[in-house]
Amino acid sequence: MIIERPSSARGHVRTGWLESRHTFSFGHYYDKAWMGFGPLRVINEDRVAPGAGFPPHRHANMEILSYVLEGGLSHQDSSGGGGVIRPGELQWMSAGHGVEHSEFNASQDAPVHFLQIWIQPDRVNAAPTYAQQAFEPADRHGAWATLASADGRAGGLPIRQDARVLGTLLAADEVVDYALDAGRLYWLHVVSGEIEANGRPLTAGDALGFADEAGRLQLTGRGTGRADVLLFDLPH
C-alpha cells in the first residue's frame, strides 16, 4: 500500500512569530486519520521569526530530531545539551524519563526554517541524552547517507528505535534507489526541490508512505537546483 500525503493537505498553524506545517496531528491541528506512521509521530516544518522561539517546555519518552534548512536554531536543555544548529546539521535529543528544553531563532534579523521530527522510542524512561552531527553535502549528492540509526550501529546519530533516517541531495536526472522490504514501513519526505518517486512527481513538503511494499524505490531529481529528501526506514 502506498499512502499519499501532499504538502497542501498538511495542517497549517500560524501565530505572530511562528508558521508551521504539520504532516501529522500536533498541537492545535488534529486529524484522527493522521496520528503518525508506525513509530514516526511528528514531522513539523516550522518557520520562526527573528529573535522568537519556544520557551522552556518538557518532553518525555520521545526521540526528537531537528533538521535546519535555513538560518540557525539555538537549543538548550536540562540534560546539559545546547548549541546552535545550522543547515547541514542534525540534532538529536532523546527525552527519556523527562527533559526540559527551549528552542529559539539564533538570529535577531533573519527567520529560521527547520523540520522537527519525533520518533517514538523502543524503550521508556531511559536517561535523557543529546547529540549533534554535521553531514557533508557532498556525501549525499546522488547517494543515500545515514543521518541516524538504531543506537548508531549503521552510522549517524544513535536514536533509540529500530529505525534509520537517510538523506539524499538530487540534481536533475540524478537517480538513487532503495530496496523496500514488505516487513518494514517507509516514509519519504521531500524537504525541498522536485523529484519523481517511481514515476510519481513530488515537490517540497510532499510525502509518500509505504506499507507492505517490496521491490525498488527509485528517486529521480527534477527541476533546477538540488532536491533535499529524507527517507525513514521504520519497524512495522
Predicted regions and their residues:
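Jelly-roll (double-stranded beta-helix
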Residues: 1-236
